[in-house]
Amino acid sequence: MKPRGATELQMEMLEKHVSKELLDQVQICTSIPGKVPLDPNKLNILWQKNSWDQPNLQEFFNNKERHKEYDWYVFNSHWNYEKFRMIFDIPTERSLVIKNGIEYFPIRKIYKRGTPIKLIHHCTPWRGLNVLLRAMQEVENPNIILDVYSSCKVYGSEFSDNSEKDFEGLYEQAKKLPNVNYIGYKPHEYIKEMMPNYDMFVYPSIFEETSCASALEALASGVHVITNNFGALYETCAEWPVYINYSKNYEQMAKDTGAAIDVAASYLHEGFMQEHLEEQQKFYKRFYNWEKKGM
């Protein structure tokens, strides 16, 4: 199985929305300099989605002479661009931001009071699953159930074979919790189709995101989001979620997340919340849809 994470999905979208004739004029390398060879006959673009602190970026970006190798640097968020600008003094005159896109805007689920409240978490396990499972132990409302699709398989068979064992303990913990269903890996198309069946996406991140495809998928589906303000999440999610303040004290962050889930469950049926989610979906269709034409 080949990798099909956010980087691969965004490349698929780019190939869908940009003509082959135009794409043939550029050489795009995603995130890791040199992963795709430089082409002297094309514009060479580094499409940077990784965080500034990744070990495989340090040698290239700390050497300013090497910054000349690419004609353009494209970043997936203003947060990410600002980090590279500030830390590595990248060539700002050859940099720009193109945010990740989303193109699935299904009919939004309208929650009815008294029905089960379904939560989804479909991020890779090192990004905060440990905090979320601890948070679910704090949730008091018996009507709340969390489905966990967390897995390493999204990054391909080789990565999964080498890494999945490191998180077996978390998966086992998830299977034992009464208000959690551990489902594991499902293809992106499955997650996308199932998203409108959920009421909340919960993500207490401990991984500095440069953007967040999982959050975008939930927000664009009109799903209520509970997350924190770590990394670029506050840019991707704007003013739509309930934000828990990021803390290195994971126990406290888990308790705060659990409390936020219970509070959100108490107002999910209210008219103001349904209006909020409707406007949320419109926002992402307006600003993150790559089908938008030039103005």
How does the language model describe each region?
Residues 196-210:
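Acidic donor-binding loop of glycosyltransferase active sites
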Residues 224-227, 234:
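Short hydrophobic beta-strand element within catalytic cores of glycosyltransferases
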Residues 112-128, 133-138, 146-147:
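Conserved donor-binding/catalytic core segment of Leloir-type glycosyltransferases
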Residues 79, 101:
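Carbohydrate-associated surface elements
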Residues 4-9, 248-252, 269-295:
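A charged, aromatic-enriched C-terminal amphipathic alpha-helix characteristic of glycosyltransferases
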Residues 1-38:
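N-terminal pre-catalytic "stem/leader" segment of glycosyltransferase-like enzymes
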Residues 160-186:
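Nucleotide-activated donor-binding/catalytic signature segment of Leloir-type glycosyltransferases, i.e.
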